[in-house]
Structures are given as C-alpha cells and as structure tokens.
C-alpha cells in the first residue's frame, strides 16, 4: 500500500506539473499571438532570445508558427552563457507531455537532433527549413560581437536580415540558473541593438530584473514589452520613454556599430546573390555533382530557390563522393581553435542532415557506430595524446580510451590507447549525395543537366554564362544568363580562368574493398590510424586511402592496393585479424579530393586574383600597404562563388559549408562567426600575407 500511495502521489504530481506547463504554454501562445502584427507583410522573421528559457517558451514559438501562414518562416537565435543549462533543458523537453501530436513530433525531432554543450553556433533545421534554431553557447556578448552581418541598414524591411524582435528569457526554478542574469548589461544590449532592425522591440519575461532591463532598453533605444506580473492579467505592457531626439541618437549609434564592424572585415568579403524579381537570371547555377553541390542545392531549396546543377557525369557522385563508405568524425587540434570548432559543428550538422533525410524516407547507408583513432607510430601516438589531454572535450565529441577499452569498443584486438568519437561512424557518400538532391527536388524547382562538361565560364554585363563544347560539331552550347554561379566541382575547382589560382591541390585516393570474413566480421566501429577501416556493409569493408599529389591517371593501381594493406598491418602490428584483410580481388575505387594546406574547406566569394596581383604591385611590404589591404574591399568576381577544397572529410565538413554558403547567398546571418568565415574564405592564403605586410 505505501508503494501504491507513492505511485499515486507521483502520478498526481506529474499530472499537476503537466497541467501547469500546458497552461504556461497557453499563456506564451497568447502572448505571441499579440505579436502577430510584427509578421504582417513578412515571409521571414528573425527572433533573438537571451537565455535558453523554458520548454514552454520554445514550444510557444513553434505553436505560433504552426498557426501562421505556411509561407512564413522563423529563424530563432538563442544565446545562452552557461553550457550546463543545455542538458537539463533537453531532459525537461524529453519528459514534457505535449498538448498536440504536432508538438510531440517537434519535441521528438529536437531531442533526436542531440544538441551538445560545446562553444559556438549549432544550427537545427525543422519543417524543411521553415523553422531554424541557431543555438549559440558562449557569452552572448562575445557571440554577437563575432556575428557577421550582411550589408544592410536598420530600416524595417521585409528582406532585412536583422532581428525583428528579442526576448529576454524568464528564469526557471526547475532548471540550472541561466547565466543571463549576470550577462544583461548595457554593453550587451548595444550589441543586440547593432544586429536589430530599428523598430525591433524587446519582450521581457525576466520579472526579477524588470526595472533594470527597462532602464537598459531606454539607454539603447529599445521599446520594451513586459508582463506586469505572473499573477496579473497576461497583458503585455509597452514601455518607451525615449524622446524623438534620444531615439535618433540611439539609431545613429547602432549604425556606427554596424559600420565599424563592416570596416574590420573588408578583406574577408561576404557577398550575396543579386535578385531580380520574376527573372530567369535568379536561378542559381551550380557546377558539380558531389556532396557539396547536392547539399547546397538542398539548402537553397529549403529557401524556395530555383537551382540548376551542371554535372559532367551521367549521374551524381561519380567522382570523390562516390565511395561506398566514408568516416564521419571531427578534426580536433590541441588548441581547439577555429578549425577544430568548425569541424565539431560540421560533424554535428552532417549527422542531423542525415537523420532528417532518413526520417523523410530516403535510403542512405550509415552506422553511427563511433570512430576509434589510434597512432601508428610514436609520433602520431604522442600527437593524439596531446590532443585529448589539451582540452576538456565534451565526452560526446571525443574522449580518451586505454588499450583495454579500445579492444572492447572495436570488438577485435586493438590493444592501443587512443581517442574515441562516440557520435561518429560512417555514411555512404554517394547515397548521401543522391538523397540530398532528391529532397531538394521535392522542395523546390531543382534539376540537373547531366553529361554536361562545362569548359568555360564568362561574365557579360553582370551575368554569368556557361559554355559546353558540343561533341558532334565542335561548337559551343551556352547556358545562362545567371546572376549567381557556384563552383562546387571537386577536382575541377580550379579549371577555369577565374578560379585557376585557388590554393587547392588534387590528391588521388584509392579506397580498397575488402570482403567481410572471419575476425573482421566482429569489427563494430570505424578504425582510423594510418588510414581507415570500416565495419562491413553489404559484406564489404573499405580501407585506405592512398594519397598521390597531382595524379596522372585514375586507373586502378596494384601498388596502391598493396600499400593500403600494409597501412593496416603497420597500424595494428602483430594482430592476427589483419591476416583477414584480403586485397586479392583487386576491388577498389579511385577518386581525387581537393586539399587545402590548412585543411579548411573553401566557401565564399570567388576572389579576383588578377586584380589582387595588380594592386599588389603598388601596395607591398610597408605599413601603408598593410593599412590598404585591411581597409580596402578585397577584389572578387561579382556573382561567382566557391564551395570546395573539402579534402578527405567532405561528408563531415561539406554539408555545413553548403548551408553557410546558402545563408550567405540569400543575405542571411551566416551560422558561423567572423573568424571562421575568414578561415574558410577562398582568398585567405593571399590575404593572410597581405594584411601582415608579407610578400604575395
């Protein structure tokens, strides 16, 4: 009986809790319905939120969107200072009883997206791009300072990328206290003001700091809407004590902040696609046919854009994206710098993109079975040890394992310490590519021209034209005009006059196909050492790959096949299971991956090297030249963009680079900070030197 009473009491408490939470959700929904006037005449809304807030607050936004016209889209950008707030929020979300099946589906999708408490911006995409959540885990003022804004003013424009409104989240006694209470300051609200439209109000759910927030909003030019109290009628109260002159002063200060930030980034251009209403020129042209181009097509389709893909093969993923299996895991560095941060975010984004495609019914082979990385000699082992001990890595990103744990994780005898990436695994690249393109075709007007080998591109009167040599006549077939052209063509990235100077080099890679047998059948995680070895898929393991610079041909190589076998044996010396690695069938696949010296992808405006080189003749090796290169917009080919240089980790880094480029092309705030955009910019190899006064 006592146990029965406890159970009844527990159920009663749970019922009471859910009833209260549902009532709070209704209150939030009522509040947001009062804000519907902000959406009048707009297709896209950008909400900013200081503090992770409550489950009910998030669900209220989703509920509001569900009742809005289907053409309306929301980008919700959440800024949370305390990383340890996230897991408790997800736990509460998982245990929440939704009032509707639609919200239940959203909750399930969000929890499956598995956001992780790491620094930076994690992009979560729902409802085919209709609802996008950017989760910024860091000091909000640091996140806002590093946020790159497209060229714009603060006017209330339907197409403005700036924030339409902000909320300051309530604190919740049932969760970890948010760091926002310590973060709210005049300096923070000026950064909020910088990224906001002039008319954007602030809605305050934080009753504890109501008076202080009201004063800060007055000083930074915001109108404030807040609840009177939790016990009073749920009617928002608008507060704005600014005179017309004070308002103008605040708006000028915002404009000055935007200008100052823009001036600091002139050498890292972030151009966007030009737009012409009802024009065929507004179609986005992409040259390519692999992971990068397919995922760019999908990201553009989620924004209702028209896309034409030009591929020189008979189908997608016939080049480097055509392997049977590819490992997915982040590239970590001891300093956990911008490159390391990018790969962590890319790693998580690729997982979520795959999960979304699988949920939509597309067939993609994969297994998130983890990745086990071990050294193959003393130097590589020491480097791995340095990486894993240098930072307090999130355990879901990576953690160290000893020799016994490594064997248990792998299912076979490894007997080496190393790094385990629990969320990693393998994905079938060509199926991942095809699924992304097929999904894009469902969402928007997206199609491909196959067997179309573009030999030449040119710009005339601001439009781009693509030229193909016709086989029968030797003449040219021309496609265009297009306002926007993206080169995402892998090994052909620098084949055109406009891109031939890009600092990316082709490396041949032969991946060997190994029949699954004996001890290899027990392998249950991806092994990475001097090369990689995957668990079997359809009776075949993949291992490799060779690494040959500027290859003369792409034929099968017996010597590279033998080298792949030797790499496995060298990596796991004396292990009996390596005798089961059989290369005698001579089964392999060869591709060329484009590699950059700094291991970062290339994403962004196509640099005009001819103009850079010409200007360099008059501006070099002096303090004045440093000032010139920092304060002069870097030369670019207007309307031409680059997406490539993905190297050996294309399925880890490519989808996020594609999503970021789509955001850039569409004039949105990019989900990468300014330092990362500088890291990825195709002009970086030259501009790094020039802004330091070094020789080109």
Swiss-Prot record:
Intracellular or extracellular location(s): Cytoplasm
Pfam short name (any one): DAO
Catalyzed chemical reaction(s): 5-aminomethyl-2-thiouridine(34) in tRNA + S-adenosyl-L-methionine = 5-methylaminomethyl-2-thiouridine(34) in tRNA + S-adenosyl-L-homocysteine + H(+)
Keyword terms, alphabetized: Cytoplasm, FAD, Flavoprotein, Methyltransferase, Multifunctional enzyme, Oxidoreductase, S-adenosyl-L-methionine, Transferase, tRNA processing
Region annotation (tRNA (mnm(5)s(2)U34)-methyltransferase) ranges: 1-262
Enzyme Commission number(s): 2.1.1.61, 1.5.-.-
Essential cofactor(s): FAD
Gene Ontology annotations of biological process type: methylation; tRNA wobble uridine modification
GO cellular component, as recorded: cytoplasm
Gene3D superfamilies: D-Amino Acid Oxidase, subunit A, domain 2 (3.30.9.10), FAD/NAD(P)-binding domain (3.50.50.60)
GO molecular function annotations of the record: flavin adenine dinucleotide binding; oxidoreductase activity, acting on the CH-NH group of donors; tRNA (5-methylaminomethyl-2-thiouridylate)(34)-methyltransferase activity
Region span, FAD-dependent cmnm(5)s(2)U34 oxidoreductase: 287-696
Major subcellular site: cytoplasm
Family to which this protein belongs: In the N-terminal section; belongs to the methyltransferase superfamily. tRNA (mnm(5)s(2)U34)-methyltransferase family. In the C-terminal section; belongs to the DAO family.
NCBIfam families: MnmC_Cterm
PANTHER family: SARCOSINE DEHYDROGENASE-RELATED, TRNA 5-METHYLAMINOMETHYL-2-THIOURIDINE BIOSYNTHESIS BIFUNCTIONAL PROTEIN MNMC
Protein task: Catalyzes the last two steps in the biosynthesis of 5-methylaminomethyl-2-thiouridine (mnm(5)s(2)U) at the wobble position (U34) in tRNA. Catalyzes the FAD-dependent demodification of cmnm(5)s(2)U34 to nm(5)s(2)U34, followed by the transfer of a methyl group from S-adenosyl-L-methionine to nm(5)s(2)U34, to form mnm(5)s(2)U34.
Name used for this protein in its record: tRNA 5-methylaminomethyl-2-thiouridine biosynthesis bifunctional protein MnmC
Lineage: Bacteria, Pseudomonadati, Pseudomonadota, Gammaproteobacteria, Alteromonadales
């Amino acid at each position: 009986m006592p146990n029965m009473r406890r159970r009844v009491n527990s159920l009663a408490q749970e019922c009471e809790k859910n009833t209260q939470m549902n009532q709070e959700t209704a209150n939030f929904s009522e509040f947001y319905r009062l804000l519907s006037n902000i959406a009048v005449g707009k297709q896209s809304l950008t909400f900013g939120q200081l503090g992770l807030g409550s489950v009910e607050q998030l669900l209220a936004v989703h509920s509001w969107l569900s009742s809005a016209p289907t053409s309306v889209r929301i980008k919700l950008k959440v800024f949370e200072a305390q990383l340890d707030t996230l897991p408790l929020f997800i736990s509460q979300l998982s245990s929440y009883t939704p009032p509707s099946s639609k919200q239940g589906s959203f909750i399930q999708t969000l929890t499956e997206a598995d956001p992780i408490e790491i620094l930076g911006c994690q992009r979560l995409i729902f409802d085919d791009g209709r609802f996008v959540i950017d989760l910024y885990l860091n000091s909000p003022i640091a996140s806002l300072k590093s946020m790159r804004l497209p060229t714009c003013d603060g006017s209330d424009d339907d197409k403005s990328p700036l924030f339409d409104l902000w909320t300051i989240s309530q604190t919740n006694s049932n969760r970890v206290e948010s760091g926002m209470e310590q973060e709210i300051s005049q300096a923070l609200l000026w950064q909020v003001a910088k990224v906001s439209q002039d008319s954007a109000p602030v809605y305050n759910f934080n009753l504890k700091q109501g008076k202080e927030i009201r004063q800060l909003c007055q000083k930074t030019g915001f109108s404030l809407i807040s609840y009177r109290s939790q016990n009073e009628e749920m009617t928002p109260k608008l507060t704005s004590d600014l005179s017309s002159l004070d308002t103008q002063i605040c708006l000028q200060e915002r404009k000055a902040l935007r200008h100052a930030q823009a001036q600091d980034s002139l050498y890292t251009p972030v151009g966007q696609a030009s737009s012409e209403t009802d024009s065929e020129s507004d179609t986005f042209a992409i040259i390519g046919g692999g992971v990068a181009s397919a995922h760019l097509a999908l990201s553009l389709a989620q924004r209702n854009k028209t896309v034409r893909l030009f591929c020189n093969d008979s189908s997608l993923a016939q080049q480097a994206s055509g392997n049977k299996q590819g490992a997915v895991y982040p590239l970590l560095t001891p300093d956990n710098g911008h490159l390391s941060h990018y790969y962590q975010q890319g790693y998580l984004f690729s997982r979520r993109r795959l999960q979304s495609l699988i949920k939509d019914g597309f067939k993609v082979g994969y297994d998130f079975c983890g990745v086990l990385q071990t050294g193959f000699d003393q130097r590589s082992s020491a480097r791995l040890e340095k990486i894993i001990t240098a930072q307090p890595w999130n355990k879901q990103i990576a953690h160290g394992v000893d020799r016994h744990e490594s064997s248990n994780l792998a299912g076979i005898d490894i007997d080496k310490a190393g790094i385990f990436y629990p969320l990693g695994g393998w994905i079938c690249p060509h199926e991942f590519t095809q699924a992304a393109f097929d999904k894009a075709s469902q969402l928007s007007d997206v199609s491909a021209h196959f067997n179309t080998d573009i030999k030449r591109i040119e710009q005339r009167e601001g439009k781009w034209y693509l030229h193909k040599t016709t086989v029968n006549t030797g003449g040219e077939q021309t496609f265009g005009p297009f306002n926007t052209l993206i080169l995402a063509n892998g090994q052909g990235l620098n084949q055109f006059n406009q891109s031939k100077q890009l600092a990316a080099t082709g490396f041949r890679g032969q991946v060997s196909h190994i029949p699954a047998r004996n001890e290899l059948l027990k392998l249950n995680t991806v092994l990475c050492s001097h090369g990689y070895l995957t668990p079997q898929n359809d009776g075949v393991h993949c291992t490799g790959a060779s690494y040959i610079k500027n290859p003369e041909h792409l034929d099968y190589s017996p010597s590279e096949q033998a080298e792949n076998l030797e790499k496995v044996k060298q990596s796991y010396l004396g292990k009996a299971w390596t005798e089961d690695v059989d290369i005698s069938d001579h089964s392999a696949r060869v591709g060329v991956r484009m590699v950059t010296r700094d291991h970062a992808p290339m994403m962004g405006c196509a640099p005009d090297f001819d103009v850079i080189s010409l200007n360099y003749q008059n501006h070099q090796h002096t303090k004045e030249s440093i000032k010139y290169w920092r304060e002069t917009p870097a030369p670019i080919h207007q309307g031409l963009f680059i997406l490539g240089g993905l190297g050996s980790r294309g399925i880890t880094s490519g989808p996020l680079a594609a999503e970021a480029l789509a955001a850039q092309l569409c004039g949105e705030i990019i989900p990468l900070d300014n330092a990362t955009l500088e890291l990825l910019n195709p002009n970086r190899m030259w501009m790094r030197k020039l802004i330091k006064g070094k020789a080109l």
